Amino acid sequence: MKKIALILITGLLAEAYGNEAEALKADSPLVLVPSNPSKCKLEKGAGPDGADAYVVYGDPKSKAKGYLTWSCPRVEYSPGTWYGVAVDVNRESCGSEVIFDNAFHRELRSSYLRRGWHQFKTCFRTFDGTNAIVDAYRIQEYNSQGRTAFANPRLVELRPEWRMEAGLELGAGEMAIGNRYTFNNDLKNPLSSCQRPFLYATMGARTGYKLDATGTCEYVYRFTLGNRSWLSASVVVAPTELVGPVKIVEFSNDGGKSWVQVGAMTDARDHEFTLPPELFPCRELTMRIRIIGADGKSRVQFRQIALEAMFDGAPVRLAGATRVYEKASGRLFLEDSARDYLTETFGAQLPASSHSLKVWAASSGRKVMRDAAVPVASTERILFKTSANEAESAQLVFTPTEDIFDIRVSVKKFDLPGTTMQILRERYHRVTLTTDQRGVSGWWPDALMPQDSDRLVVKGGESQPFFLRVKPPKDAKKGIYNGTLEVRYVGIDGQKTLDVPFAVEVFGFCFPERLSLATTFGLNMGVVANYHKAKSEADRRTLLRKYLKVLADSHIATHPITLAKPTLKWTNQNDPDGVKLEIDWTEFDRDMTEFYDGLKLNNFRFRIEGIGYSDHDNLHEPVIAGVKRGNPQYERLMGMYLTEVQRHLEKKGWIDGVWVQTFDEPTSQHFEYVRWQNSLVERYAPKLRRLMTPTDGPNLAISGINIWCPVPYHLHTEDLPKCRTRGDDIWWYICCSPPGTWAGMHIDHPGVDLRVWSWQSWDENVTGLLYWMVNWWTGRSGYADPQRPQNPYLDPAGWGKRAKPLSRAHVWGNGEGRFIYPPVACADARQSETVLDGPNSSYRLELLREGIEDYEYFAMLKRLDPSNRLLKVPESVTRRLDDYSTDPTAMEEHRIKMAREIERLKQGSRDVGHDEQ
């Protein structure tokens, strides 16, 4: 089929397409007509490069919700055919749902559509059959909040190709490591409908952002692996919504001639089914998911389907990849090879390595999977390169041929007194459903555990990493310092001991204590108190101190950093002339002195009383001292309060670090309210920096803001340069699920992600990182009973807040909202006694720390030489926000170059150990 141009026109053409009109075909222009000509308008030349724009106008103040649609009423699709849709989009206001929709496919990707013209692409496959299928194609916006424009839309027939290697064909979502095969149909991936195992869906079943089925219908997948035979398998099916009759999962090993039911689903939770032995061995497995006893109200949506299987033959290491081409032109339309990093070999064997136990070193930037390949390369020692007062990390990995037990690693000797070395065991978490196309089902490392947390067993053929973190003292002098690690373990023939040499090269400068990159991460002390069973204010303060210390060691400031609030005492508040305000700062000042000053933090959030702090789900009325907004006395009281807050923070020397936030993630319907809030703060306390997390990027329509904090894919707006010019700070945040090709914070993402986030921050002149929470350990969507919360060690998923377990499930991603873990003694919050131990860190938090320290190298170098060529981030590290290297080598090499340059520029200093205090 030739490429089809989608031509949109106004409602004047709608009458031409009644039920009896001939369906438009391949070489005919497809005509889209508006559902509401007063709100869907053609704007000549308003698109990119002078193209016409097809615009939807919504009213952010309207409470009415509904669809505004541009559609081609009748399109003829060939059966069993792949198609792609490409359209330029400029979504000027967030808060709505943009939907690309027909009978085969329903694509929602609203959070990734942004201000400024950019191209959106998606794929789908039509139902099998012998006859052409006539249906509409729709571009819709639900609950439109403003202006959204489309241009240059086109529909093309596609031809998919899958990676062929070693006689095996694997596509995106598939992986074979050793003799283990995995498949995840990540539905956030625009190529999910072009995955190799997807065979067909019947009428009523649609692919897209979620598998969406109503009435009687079915989805069918077929799994083959060349000439290999399947030996065993299990499948996980995860509904997000399930209403009506039973949905059953069936498998066939004879191409669908006979079926075996392996499970049934009656509620919206993750369902895992093991396939019965009588299906094996076999060359192919066909899976069918269908609704039985359907009625008009039947509905099911799936967020993911995952299959794990063992196969025969020689072991392999292969990640699948998919490319889809436009059939008529041969041009590449989309591609996905997001899992390639999982098959790479890295690291080097150490002298202690033997036939029965491989001992090897790996960069901290590589996640060591249990099935990691042992490297062929060798090295004489583990080498750390760092400055005085700076932490640096590496991994020590053990891969035995037979089971070993109770590995313990300790420092036997070291030449540099005052150096601290943490040696933590990496704990694996079973990921059954991936966050996005970067991940794979299996065991992923994350929590960093004390070595005495339990008795460790390492199975033969599997790898176990230890995370090493070394930090020289402030007064350490330039040089190379040698040391030895002692390793003890129990093998099949008893206790064993071996030595592992290491060295620390200390650069000729000292790392600063208070850093340049602002970080502010949410900490929920209510969750901490619940898990630890804190019984008193003293318990809560002890825990706060320990949690803040662990996070500050990775340069993370939290919001809040104190449980204390200034106490306001009003007298005569109803008397405009006699009103007085006294603020008791005692407890607040005590905590700020201990935590903000003592931990050398570089920013803190101050929560303003009376301003009506809100978010897009919860609007709160501004009230201070019982006086509501609208009362003439309200602004007088707020003015007195804000003036005193600024005066006190200036007096204490904290004014440069403070910022305030009045509204979280406002949409256009909230802009007027946000303008009022921040203008009030600016009027009476102008030195309090005012932060906003805009859902559609920096936007000067909102006045009073001087810290803009968008998500990365909403950073580049037309107002961004203007914000910079007037001196505003630019921070950013990641939340829930950034697109899978962007750096994220999830457990099942490449190890470098959180480190490269700081490199991209420097590259984009971003000066702050924000994250919503570090200890979201349980969510009501997955764990509705508050007395039986989630154990984050056993379930890595970040579950949503809303509890509708029988009909809906909402999950954000693996590790979402979680950078630290509770102690094992209170991991499920079901113990009776109070636990006062501090939290356990995570691999991801440590890599975030390394990125923050890399950022400081850039900042130090810029202070010494503002035009230095090394201040440019190499393209070998990151080319675009959605195109970065998953190999940490280029980052590590550039960091060393910067260190050498800083040393060179500091030559002549008599005491380089104290230059950067």
Placement of each model-derived feature along the sequence:
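Short carbohydrate-recognition loop motifs
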Residues: 43-65, 199-215
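Extracellular ligand-binding interfaces
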Residues: 62-128, 144-146, 239-263
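Extracellular beta-strand ligand-recognition surfaces/modules
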Residues: 85-87, 121-153, 277-297
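Exposed low-complexity, polar/acidic, P/S/T/G-rich flexible segments that act as propeptides
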Residues: 147-167, 292-338
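Catalytic domains of carbohydrate-active enzymes that cleave complex glycans
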Residues: 173, 178-186, 323-338, 609-674, ...
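Extended acidic/polar, glycine-enriched regions
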Residues: 296-299, 399-407, 413, 455-514
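Surface-exposed binding patches on compact interaction domains or structured appendages
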Residues: 339-378, 391, 401-468, 476
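Aromatic-lined carbohydrate-binding surfaces of glycoside hydrolases
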Residues: 444, 452-453, 470-471, 481-489, ...
